[in-house]
Amino acid sequence: VIAIQGNFDRALATVQEVANQYPITLVNSVNPYRLEGQKTAAFEVVDALGEAPDWLCIPVGNAGNITAYWMGFNEYKRAGHSRCLPRMMGFQAAGSAPLVLGHTVEQPDTIATAIRIGNPVNKENALKARSESNGDFMAVTDAEIIEAYKLLGSGEGVFCEPASAASVAGLIKRRAEVPAGATVVCVLTGNGLKDPSTAIENNDSRFHTGLAPDTDVVAKVMGF
């Protein structure tokens, strides 16, 4: 593992140059073969539901996932496995929202490290997915991301990385627009162990200081 100084965009530009000059394969989503693999997640969604969802909510950083999912839904529909296509709803962190703002963000900043990207390499494909699906891009704040992050942990027992929670934060923000009876899928893109410090820093004081070594106290916190 090699650490490169600067942000994601600078690091990606560097490794692209390295890959162009040396016998190295870049497996970032700039690589079309990666998208071909990622698109199969859309197949799995349709297989699980029996049809494409009405909305597909997804975090957007480098925009590879939203590009790949849209590819997958279209291919599966053409193959006769579904009758409809979802609205592609992409959510970016407010401090790193180039697709929402319409321009590159030179110094992206967000707690959601996986989408802390100011110049997504798949931006044109993502814009196409939004346009073709009648979808939308929207920014969510770090506070909204953390709220959704905690909700997923406490309500669903899912420990995801902060970037993943952006899809749920976005759905919460847009919930009034969801048609009655609609099927909505939120994609969680990464495990919480990718960014465990967020769980520690954003937990309540009981996690930091510990509970008194008392059976009743511990049982109460556990909900008994």
Task: Please report, for each region that a protein language model flagged, where it lies by residue.
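Short glycine/serine/threonine-rich phosphate/pyrophosphate-binding segments
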Residues: L35, N62-Y69, S96-V100, A163-L171
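Active-site/ligand-binding loops adjacent to catalytic centers
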Residues: V1-Y33, E75-F159, E201-F224
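Catalytic phosphate/nucleotide-handling subdomain of diverse soluble enzymes
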Residues: V168-F224
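A structured beta-alpha segment of the ubiquitous adenosine-cofactor-binding alpha/beta core
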Residues: V27-G50, K77
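Glycine-rich ThDP/TPP pyrophosphate-binding loop and its adjacent helix/strand module
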Residues: K39, V45, L49-M71
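Beta-strand segments within the central parallel beta-sheet cores of soluble alpha/beta enzyme folds
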Residues: D54-L56, R83-Q92, A182-V187
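Short glycine/threonine-rich catalytic loop with a Thr-x-Gly-x-Asp
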Residues: V60-G64, N122, E156-S164
